[in-house]
Amino acid sequence: MAKYERTLNGDFNGLLRRIEDGILNGSFSASLEETSDFYENGARCSVRVFERYSYTGGNRLSMSVTLFQNGGPIHLSAVTSGGSQALFFKINTWGEETFLDCIKKIIEE
């Protein structure tokens, strides 16, 4: 598992679109598997689960992206999983780190 978290300022909807477009257009095998959105008392939470094939690992892996805002800055959490091939411990997590690099590039550009 790999994790990336940031606190950002800006437009929630614009950031969410940028993340979705950037991930889906940044990898030939990336797909948006599921979405969830909550609004309550001015707070907003959006969850996106992406999946892609890792050529280096020879397997599929997922990335869950959560955005949360309650009137102030936007909190971002991205977690990747599924890149290991071992049964009892994690080895070969390059695919997870590479997938996470996609969102880092989107956020830090």
What kind of region is each of these model predictions?
Residues 1-27, 35:
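Terminal, regulation- and interaction-focused segments at domain boundaries
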Residues 32-41:
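Short Gly/Thr-rich strand-loop-strand
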Residues 10, 14, 60, 94, ...:
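Conserved active-site and cofactor/substrate-binding residues in soluble primary-metabolism enzymes
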